[in-house]
Regions:
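A glycine-rich dinucleotide-binding beta-alpha-beta segment and adjacent secondary-structure elements
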Residues: 118-197
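Glycine-rich phosphate/pyrophosphate-binding beta-alpha loops
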Residues: 32-40, 60-66, 161-165, 193-210
């Protein structure tokens, strides 16, 4: 198993195989995955870093990619900025995630410890893209270009969490191998505990189909 926050995901499979002499692969790797933030809001909003610079299209294909984008930002600080129209469209389920609300963008910036003028300029530029239906910075799908213009305005701090990777080296028949490439008799592995090739930006499918095949 790989630790993605579930209390039962403690690496028991990896530890057991290591005790039996398995060759463990990728144990120093980790994935930055976005912590639980409502995607209905984040994809329609604007994301900025600590300098109030927008840093991507807000429409990442997978939370691991979204988390990695946050990890690349200065001090790993990122904010999701949106207005009350976007909040209302997402429903009440979004409200618990909102950390800052203000009647103006400048006041919202102060609450988030951001530069008020810089954030106001960033929002104005983004709203221009929304009006034209063309994102000149990151080519965001026009379907998700929603202007940020109706007060109150809201912000969610975007955070990533670590998901540990690594697993046993196996052969095509799912035998677990030792560091010399020899089969450890009677020991098999499939699924995430044998998923040594999953890393920060490489997503192989976690091997769950192999686990079903072995079963």
């Amino acid at each position: 198993n790989s630790s993605a926050g579930h209390p039962s995901a403690m690496g028991d499979g990896q530890r057991m195989m290591a005790r039996h002499g398995a060759d463990m692969v990728g144990m120093g790797e980790a994935t930055h995955t976005l912590s639980k933030i409502p995607q209905e809001t984040t994809i329609r909003s604007m994301h900025v870093n600590a300098a109030c610079n927008r840093y991507w299209s807000e429409q990442g294909w997978h939370n691991d990619h979204r988390g990695s984008m946050i990890h690349k930002q200065p001090m790993q600080i990122a904010w999701c900025i949106f207005d009350d129209n976007i909040r209302a469209a997402a429903g009440d389920a979004e409200d618990d995630a909102i950390q800052c609300t203000a009647d103006t963008i400048e006041k919202l910036a102060e609450m988030c410890a951001l530069d008020p003028r810089a954030l106001a300029d960033a929002v104005a530029r983004y709203n221009g893209y929304c009006a034209e239906g063309v994102d000149l910075e990151y080519a965001k799908d026009p379907e998700f270009l929603i202007p940020i213009e109706k007060a109150p305005f809201h912000a969610i701090r975007l955070r990533y969490v670590w998901m540990s990777n690594g697993g046993a080296h196996i052969d095509p028949e799912a035998h677990v191998l030792d560091p010399d490439g020899n089969v450890i008799e009677g020991l098999f592995a499939a699924g995430a505990c044998a998923n040594g090739h999953k890393s920060n930006m490489f997503y192989p499918g976690t091997g769950l189909d192999m686990a079903l095949g072995v079963l």
